[in-house]
Amino acid sequence: MLGDFIIRLLVLILGYTYPAFECFKTVEKNKVDIEELRFWCQYWILLALISSFERVGDFFISWLPLYGEMKVVFFVYLWYPKTKGTRHVYETLLKPYMAQHETEIDRKIMELRARAWDFFIFYFNNFAQAGQSTLIQGFQYVLAQSVRFSAAAANQPPTERNVNMNAQSPVEMDNDPPSPRAPRPLNKSLSALRSLEKQTSRGRKWPPPTPPPTPGRDSAGTFNGDDGVNIPDTIPGSPLTDARAKLRRSNSRTQPAA
């Protein structure tokens, strides 16, 4: 693992970083050397092709001993001033092959570009249609569920409605409008009145017992006043009865004194 890391680091430094710095110095010179600039252009062309096929080579021939070290040496060979292997590889291998197959390569590139564009348009249209149909189906499903829920709530029995109302939270109960109270049945009201009359008849005796005779009261239940007027005493417990009792007491006190 450590050896692979060091090899990759050397490839990045010696194959990319240092050549990029040398190319920068060549471009920024006051008097640009065309041959040197052409050399670095050829180097970056070879490096791009090597980077494109490097993964395939790593998969098939990475088992060779000193494979990573050979890559580092090859990159140094390409740009080293005394060897300048870039010119040799470019002039002897790459340039003849590209000159022979340049038109065919251009045609293949144009065909691939057209096929890629057709492929993109085809799948874009399919995905757009599928997405539109899926969106419409989703809206239809939501609408059907809402209609079904409203129909089920309308056909729900009153008992289940009461259960659902009891299951609501206090906030929901406060927000709900008060429902009108149903009138009580007439039979239940009559039975309640009868039971109330029975309870009151058991609790009191009617007619009430007659009080003991007092002075000034005759056998007919009338009170003889000072003027000899008979005042009937037929409402027990009323204020008039209390006033008559006080009057009797005062008369009874005054008679012995006389």
From Swiss-Prot:
Pfam families: TB2_DP1_HVA22. InterPro entries: TB2_DP1_HVA22 (IPR004345). It comes from Arabidopsis thaliana. Residues 156-169 have a biased composition (Polar residues). Residues 153-258 are annotated as: Disordered. Residues 206-215 have a biased composition (Pro residues). This is HVA22-like protein j. Belongs to the DP1 family.
